[in-house]
């Protein structure tokens, strides 16, 4: 039995009450307003290139700010149960913070999100060697992944909402990957309190591709402390166990009877320090969950509720997996927005994705994109509040 602090026990009790209300989760009352999208300067890169911030606001007042460097989501303001707006994502106040070595706060990650074992794979008889940046492995595209490049950006608006489209071309051989890859990632904020991400990509040579978004959430608000009391539901009967370097073993293991069973809603803190070899391997949760699906349509993947604020987050995706990461490597050395020091487990990520190291696991869903075909996927984050 894992020891649970009195504070966490109280939080879990509140979460249980909210769980009973989750089917009635609703957005805050509509406020009179008009959706808008604006563009403003956000600093200059060492190369001399200018970076811009795009601010998306829906009719209800929810606001997303993102920059064209890394497609990074700077802030995301949503209301709590009392109607008070707070920023619910981790990050920095200025560009300088993101230019340092960071834990991918808010960024688009690729060309291959997550890990590739030993930084190598074989494709069509040729072996490719990638830049390694995570022990022996390649992580999130390598040393200069999509999180560290300037994207071309343009505002968008259609019947669904306001947005910004980011486009980037990754040249053949960059970080060791084959093929010139053109990627378009569109962020859209709707008046239904949805933040949708649409990914598209084409290539001129066969290449592995795995795109994701690496935002760290804290539904109590940025700088509000740990997320151990957040109640998480993940629609997955299985997960992919990992070795000591966080590379999947190839097994699709049942979550039943393990700390990885989030099918009915569990507080993050209940199992995060369990005496389980997989928990020890990740220092908490840093694992891919195999979503329950029968096709590649948009399906519900996860739900998070914060009993302190009443905020809820639902995630739907066309991807086969989601990486649940609990900020285990935040160590108190990073100072973020408004002087907040980010300590262990101060945020969580739900990174929709294909499985880690898929190029080396033919039994996993394929991540190989070939010329003449287009990769496309969609992820939707929906924000709400539980009724009082």
Task: State what each model feature region is.
Residues 2-12:
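Bacterial N-terminal signal peptides that target proteins for export
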Residues 11-23:
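Bacterial N-terminal signal peptides
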Residues 24-62, 67-388:
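An exposed, glycine/acidic-rich loop-and-rim segment of catalytic or binding clefts
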């Amino acid at each position: 039995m894992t020891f649970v602090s009195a504070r966490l026990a109280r939080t879990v009790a509140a979460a249980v009450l909210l769980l009973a209300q989750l089917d009635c989760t609703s957005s805050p009352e509509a406020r009179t307003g008009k959706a808008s999208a604006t563009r403003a300067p956000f600093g200059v890169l060492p190369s001399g290139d200018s970076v811009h911030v795009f601010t998306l606001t829906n009719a209800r007042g929810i606001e997303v700010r993102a920059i064209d460097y890394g497609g990074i989501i700077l802030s995301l303001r949503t209301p709590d149960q009392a109607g008070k707006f707070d920023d619910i994502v981790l990050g920095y106040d200025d560009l300088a913070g993101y230019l340092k070595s960071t834990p991918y706060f808010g960024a688009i990650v690729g060309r291959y999100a997550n890990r590739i074992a030993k930084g190598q794979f074989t494709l069509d008889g040729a072996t490719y060697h990638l830049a390694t940046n995570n022990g022996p492995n390649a992580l999130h595209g390598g040393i200069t992944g999509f999180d560290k490049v300037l994207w071309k950006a343009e505002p968008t608006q259609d019947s669904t909402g306001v947005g910004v489209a980011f486009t980037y071309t990754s040249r053949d051989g960059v970080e060791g990957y084959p093929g010139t890859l053109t990627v378009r990632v569109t962020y859209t904020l709707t008046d239904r309190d949805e933040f949708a991400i649409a990914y598209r990509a084409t290539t001129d040579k066969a290449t592995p591709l795995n795109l994701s978004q690496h935002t760290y959430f804290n539904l109590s608000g940025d700088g509000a402390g740990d997320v151990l009391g957040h109640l998480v539901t993940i629609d997955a009967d299985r997960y992919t166990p990992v070795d000591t370097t966080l590379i999947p073993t190839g097994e699709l293991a049942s979550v039943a009877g393990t700390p990885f069973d989030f099918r009915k809603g569990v507080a993050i803190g209940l199992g995060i320090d369990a005496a389980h070899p997989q928990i020890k391997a990740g220092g908490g949760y840093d694992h891919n969950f195999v979503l329950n699906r029968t096709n590649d349509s948009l399906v519900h993947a996860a739900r998070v509720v914060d009993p302190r604020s009443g905020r809820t987050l639902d995630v739907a995706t066309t991807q086969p997996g989601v990486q649940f990461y609990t900020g285990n490597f935040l160590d108190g050395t990073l100072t973020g927005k408004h002087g907040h020091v980010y300590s262990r487990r101060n945020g969580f990520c739900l990174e929709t994705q294909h499985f880690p190291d898929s190029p080396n696991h033919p039994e996993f869903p394929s991540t190989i994109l070939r010329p003449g075909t287009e990769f496309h996927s969609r992820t939707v984050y929906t924000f709400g509040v539980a009724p009082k």
